[in-house]
Amino acid sequence: LTAVPDALMAKAKYPDRFYVFTSFDVSEYFKHGKEIGKYQAKFVENMRRCGCDGLKIIEGKPTMRKIMGAIPGFDEPCWEPLWKYLEDTQFPVLWHLNDPESCWGPEEKAPRHIRLGNELYDDTFVNNEEQYHQMEEILQRHPNIKFIFAHLYFMSAQLPRLAKILDTYPNVMVDITPGLEIYVNLSKNTEEAKEFFEKYQDRIMYGTDIGARCVLAENAQPLNEEECLARMDLIDGLFQAETHRILKEDGRYLINTDDFLQLGFDLSEEALNKIYWKNFE
């Protein structure tokens, strides 16, 4: 099932307020696994003609790769027609690749929400470093694809490593969608974090994952305004002021979480404007 048709209807009604990123046709993994890139490229082109503005790849999330089972490594030759298509058309790609590094343990060091959320991965899941390697292979072959890596590419604890990627591949961007661990990690070294965000202010985009729980819910449910506001408050508290506050489990967005100290770093107005909206234009 997909929410793309509903999203395209919203875009048709409010064309200046909605942008739609299609997902893949998951049935192609089972029908044409050995030619997956060719058939997904055709599907993405059709969705582009329907009015989609980009592609969202969720298959880089380890749980998705395990559930699907039939997803080839992203650097395998069968994907090449898709990567070539995306590079030739400059069709943007928002990619959820990997998950927080703490998901790979050890369990005793993992945050409470990872442990209680059953998000600890064993060797039956794809390894995060293996996926980073696959992505590096793709970037070397197709450096001009417009990639946006969600959740700071899950490198909020490795900003120098992320900086090297941004320096090497000028078309790569990242977004700041929570994952709580992003905000925990950035609060640990606000001087380094502020320097990174000011330097790469042209390469960072706003994101929230607002509405994700509605889409993933087994039964239809309305958008939770309190959760939406909690997500935005978490982001704003990091970037807009020299925040110094203890964030506790609130039952809205912060669920099963450890208490943590959030330290903000008061980004410049120029950087905020770019991150919040200008970089999406």
Range-by-range predicted roles:
Residues 3-119, 124, 173, 178-180:
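Active-site gating/metal-coordination segments in enzymes
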Residues 3-11, 32-44, 104-110, 128-140, ...:
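Distinct, well-ordered alpha-helical segments
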Residues 14, 88-89, 142-143, 168-169, ...:
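Helix C-cap/helix->beta junction micro-motif
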Residues 120, 141-148:
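Short, surface-exposed connector motifs at secondary-structure boundaries
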Residues 130-137, 146-281:
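H/E-rich (His + Asp/Glu) clusters that bind or coordinate divalent metals
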